[in-house]
Amino acid sequence: VVGDTPSLYPSYIDTVSSLEIPIYRAIGNHDMTYGGRTFEYSYRTFESYFGPIYYSLNKGNAHYIVLDNCFYVNRDYQYIGYIDERTFQWLEKDLSYVPKDKLVFVVMHIPSSLQKKLRYNTLDQDETVNTAALYKLLEGYNAHIISGHTHFNVNVCFNDSLMEHNTAAVCGTWWRADINVDGTPRGYGVYEVDGNQVKWLYKSA
């Protein structure tokens, strides 16, 4: 949201309030507070401004789920892609109220899975290590995972009912250039939902 500068949260809130449209946020690695002794400390500031780090809502025939999969591991700026048990228990209960004919979106910062050639490092920071449990809970739904974190665009079809859309960071190559590492221009993803049908596109900015 503000690139490792939580003191800017009030200014950010003032700015987006003028848009007069609902804004839903998913916490990312640059939104955490580092230096504490536990994972729970890492999201307290974000949560105090924006509410729970995982939640869900319904719009039309779609059910939207926002998760936190940035797990702080008690070292300065060290985290892994991981969904904790508390979140899984909540998600399991949440989905128990969602009919199978509902379109489901799962929004989280770190991708659920990446091809090996697309990973930046071997620290499990670029994909979610326990993602198989998430896929299991989504079985039977027409589900789309929307993730960020990387600086490239890729769509992955896991099977006939599960797809992931990984959208490049709006900063491109870390604000050094107006392109992402895959050569696409800086921009954002747009998803159009009509009943159970989803169309998506990428818009340069």
Regions found by a protein language model. Name each.
Residues 1, 95-120:
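Short acidic, glycine-rich surface-loop motifs adjacent to enzyme active sites
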